[in-house]
């Protein structure tokens, strides 16, 4: 795997870039940074419809290319790309989005989540470790941003929040796999002096999110309902776990992308202008929001706005649209991040939840 592109200021490897967050980031970054070259590696799973459809905006850009690869199982090809062909591919930045993220699926097949989420990132770290062993001059000039999750902290009591120094207390197989990866990253930083920054965000929502997540699931079922021949009965109701009162904080995808951009550019600027280890190396940043809402209230808001916009319906009988199902094996009561640290770099969320939801419905549904 070689490249024939011109010389660029930097060469970014974006893993998991064909999915929800990764593809939105690439739309933003490929356009904003024409002096950077972006290589996207993705295995093309169900969340991207097994295609590069979410990459249609960037596929033909001169500073972009796509490689289909499963990081967890194709170590040989990853090694060839990153190590053997390093003189050509010249990776200077890595942003790792690659992971399976469905909590519900992780309860069904926890072993798969362990294998996939841990090996995909550790294979990436191994290639970086070997590359830096061969090219010591890259040690303080290659920066790595890993996208983790707030779920590694477990649940928080009412009115409590966790900061970046809080202990990890995952409660689902998915969260445990992500926490394990965070610790493996920490070990590689200490043992092999790899410059890595970790990002942990609240629930991210926006266009292209797969319908297994609450917001797109709700919107998908409402869209199906209005396309029925008759709107008397909703044939496929919106499902809520337990009593629907579990709380989450929501962050719009565009706000999250701005936070990622801030972190990777700050880390990159530091390593480019110093032979010393970046101050960002080893740092963890919570990317949070103050928009907290329980699942039932969230779904009711979406139903109200969507059905009024599409069918002019008011004063809904929510029982016609919502059904309650057995709760998860374990369902965290709430997540809440203290994000003062990223605020100190100048970032704050700009899109309120209600505004973001209305815009999502108006433009995509």
UniProtKB/Swiss-Prot annotation:
The UniProt record lists the keyword Nucleus: yes
Subcellular location field: Cytoplasm; Nucleus
Gene Ontology biological process terms in this record: nucleotide-sugar metabolic process
CC per GO annotation: cytosol; nucleus
SUPFAM superfamilies, per database record: NAD(P)-binding Rossmann-fold domains (SSF51735)
Segments forming a coiled coil: none
Molecular function terms from GO: dTDP-glucose 4,6-dehydratase activity; oxidoreductase activity
UniProt KW keywords: Cytoplasm, Nucleus
Cleaved signal peptide residues: none
Superkingdom to which the source organism belongs: Eukaryota
Pfam families to which the protein is assigned, alphabetical: GDP_Man_Dehyd (PF16363)
Family: Belongs to the NAD(P)-dependent epimerase/dehydratase family.
Name used for this protein in its record: Uncharacterized protein PB2B2.11
